[in-house]
Amino acid sequence: MIIAGRCICCDGDRLRKSPAVLMPFVAKRVFDWEPVEITPDWGMQTLSPGMAYPLCNSIQCTDCGALFLDMRFDEAEMGRLYSGYRDPTYTAARERFEPGYAARNLMLSERAAYLSEVEAIIGPYLSKPLHVLDWGGDTGLNTPFLHRAESVSVYDISGLAVAEGITAVDRCGLASAPFTLVVCSNVLEHVPSPAALLGDIASVMRPDSLLYLEVPLEAYVAENAGAENLATGKKHWHEHINFFTETALRALVARCGLKIVHLETLETEIYGRLGRQFCLLCARV
């Protein structure tokens, strides 16, 4: 783990920070840390009794508005956090800290209905034959054009088995296949270096390939649009360690040698909850 000293999107150094806590499930999964109660019998001279949780900082870039956790997990830590993502072992561990998670997780076993809206947004820009790579696509259940593309491949660190009809690829296989559409949907909010990830993706894109990016417009950001003090109100961090603004996304994409072909904010129902998603279609410069 390293502590961020620059913006994860625009690479600026004009940052504001405020204390927060790392949620117990993430702390346990990544660092094997447990919450602990400080009691009077500890005999502490300068600490007050009460529950102790892992401390961190919320950081906001004053240039692009990106809001993020200061902790940037390394490859091994990310592996511990996402290995077997949402499988029975993962779900049981998370249920211990977050009662009700297992029930919510059951809903995610079905393909998301809003994907038809995503396909309608990006479909007009695509040409055939369509070969799709879903980068960070889990099992491939929610890959756009799943049943309409000539081929669908998934690259994911979870190690989960992919859905029928999908090919799982490793890093070596990424460079050898002629992908016309690369999808990176609901991934950038999880990763320690969005810029590094986009650089990796750009390296496997052909000159005529398109990249579809999708990230949440988090409610806290949407409800406080334009605010420069978001760090003070963001008191906890879970698996979404990056909160994006449109300005931040534009800066990130440009920094990574990509250009935006289409950008819109989709407001729709996602697994029973109303949500907002940034939807970007990008090409190499």
Describe every region a protein language model picked out.
Residues 186, 190, 240:
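Histidine-centered divalent metal-coordination motifs
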Residues 201:
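Class I S-adenosylmethionine-dependent transferase superfamily signal
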Residues 190-191, 220:
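Short glycine-rich, flexible loops that bind phosphorylated cofactors or substrates
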Residues 5, 239-242, 246-256, 260-285:
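Rossmann-like AdoMet/SAM-dependent catalytic core
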Residues 24-35, 213-242, 247-252:
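Short, glycine-/aromatic-enriched active-site segment of Class I SAM-dependent methyltransferases
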Residues 162, 221-222, 270:
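Generic structural signal for helix capping and beta-alpha/helix-loop junctions
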Residues 1-185, 194-198, 212, 228-232, ...:
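Conserved N-terminal segment of class I S-adenosyl-L-methionine
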Residues 205-211:
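Short glycine-dipeptide loop
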